[in-house]
Design a protein with these regions (language model features):
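Coiled-coil dimerization/phosphotransfer module
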Residues: 1-162
Length: 162
């Protein structure tokens, strides 16, 4: 029993460490994306092409947190379901919105099944983006890879730390 409990505790600690958000409050928006990519590459050994063009240096903390979590979950999904094949992230700004695109060349899936059991990551990403007044879409089809696209407004209120 003691060994089983130690093993379970080790497993729970590993999960909890993945839930903790790194300190991104002082990072620029680009550095936040770079941090998400670097963390992913270190954990998986997979490389990600990151293209950052014309984004503001800074953004409200809720936008940085949502961006980080969106990138983290998108890359993790790609790794789990598509072996991290040809992953690419594009970040740009247009009309006061941060546009995030995460693509892979994996096997793809039918987006109509996004809200069924086992697709909680996609639903969680959508909720995070929509809470900030943004939009979220998934483009995919069997055998053709997947693109996750989010538009986040860059003018959201800052959250006071307690």
């Amino acid at each position: 029993i003691h060994t089983a409990l130690q093993s379970a505790l080790k497993y729970l600690r590993a999960i909890a460490s993945g839930l903790r958000l790194p300190e991104i409050g002082t990072l620029t928006l680009a550095e936040t994306a770079e941090r998400a990519v670097r963390d992913y590459e270190r954990k998986t050994g997979k490389m990600v092409a990151l293209a950052i063009g014309g984004i503001p240096v800074d953004a409200p903390l809720p936008v940085k947190i949502t961006s980080y979590r969106l990138l983290q979950e998108s890359l993790a999904n790609s790794y789990r379901h598509a072996s991290g094949v040809d992953q690419r992230i594009d970040l740009k700004e247009s009309d006061g919105q941060l546009i995030i695109e995460v693509t892979d060349a994996g096997q793809g899936f039918d987006p109509k099944i996004m809200n069924v059991d086992g697709r909680l990551g996609l639903a969680g990403m959508r909720e995070r983006v929509e809470i900030l007044g943004g939009t979220f879409e998934v483009q995919s089809e069997a055998g053709a890879g997947t693109t996750i696209r989010a538009h986040l407004p860059l003018a959201v209120p800052e959250v006071e730390s307690e």
